[in-house]
Amino acid sequence: MKKKVTLACKNCGSRNYTTMKSSAALAERLEVKKYCNNCNSHTVHLETK
């Protein structure tokens, strides 16, 4: 079963993206490099609760 998670920019904290995460990988937090409109650059986005 997959769970819906929100990704927030590490620099500004803006919640820009949502994605689905496998329940098998729930122990570790997701970390993805994506584009942030507020920072106007590609930054690391972290999974939020």
Curated annotation (Swiss-Prot):
Alphabetical UniProt keywords: Ribonucleoprotein, Ribosomal protein
One annotated GO molecular function: structural constituent of ribosome
GO biological process assignments: translation
Gene Ontology CC: one annotated term: ribosome
Pfam family, one: Ribosomal_L33
Keyword Ribosomal protein recorded: yes
UniProt family annotation: Belongs to the bacterial ribosomal protein bL33 family.
Protein name per Swiss-Prot or TrEMBL: Large ribosomal subunit protein bL33B
Native source species: Bacillus licheniformis
